[in-house]
Amino acid sequence: MTRCFLKFIFILILTNLSFKSVANDKILLIGDSLSAGYGLEQAQAWVHLLQNKYSDDNKAITIINTAISGQTTDNALLKIDAWLKAHQPSHVLIELGGNDGIRGFPVKLLQKHLTQLVTKSQQHGAKVALMEIHIPPNLGPRYRQMFTDSYSKVTKQTGAYLMPYFMSDIAVDSSLMLNDNLHPNVKAQPIIRDFMSIEIDKWLQD
């Protein structure tokens, strides 16, 4: 009886360990200055705050942040193969396009690059989320609309997950922005952390 009970406990432990191993989510974040913590100490940036939250909540989620200030979709395409090989992510979150838009890159080129980033990640076995980026109004209503629509088009074509933009409510509040009116300040970082915590949970459960 005792031997059977011990065997049962041992199987439960192995099952639990196996479940924990499967439940580990490794998210490769490919982004620009908005995720790189532009103008801030790294410990103040939303990605660092969110990773701390996952640790505090005992969530087996790791964020690998490859965000670089000024990064465009074509820059990321030059590096994504190496990132995927080095980090072997289960998930890839793409927060890119803002710099493409500010520089007036053609919308079709943006869509092509985003599609390539998504499909490369999917071919590597990762689940992909594409954040719907919005650009400043001074770039003109027609270009802005075509730009924003690119994200839903790419997700429909590729089956990627469309994630809402974390700057939508922040960009219109000057108290949450740096003096350049392009980047979120330190006060905005916990707000972005909480927003992304909710949105990433939705994505992982999708």
Predicted segments with their positions:
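Active-site micro-motifs of SAM-dependent methyltransferase domains
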Residues: 35-36, 70, 135, 172
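Serine-esterase "nucleophile elbow" of acetyl-processing enzymes
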Residues: 22-69, 79-88
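Catalytic-site microenvironment of enzymes
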Residues: 9, 24-27, 59, 68, ...
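N-terminal signal peptide c-region/cleavage motif recognized by signal peptidases
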Residues: 18-20
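Alpha-helical cap/lid subdomain in secreted, periplasmic
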Residues: 75-206
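Hydrophobic helical h-region of N-terminal Sec-dependent signal peptides
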Residues: 10-14
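Short, surface-exposed alpha-helical recognition segments that flank or form part
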Residues: 41, 68-71, 105, 184
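Bacterial N-terminal signal peptides that target proteins for export
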Residues: 1-9
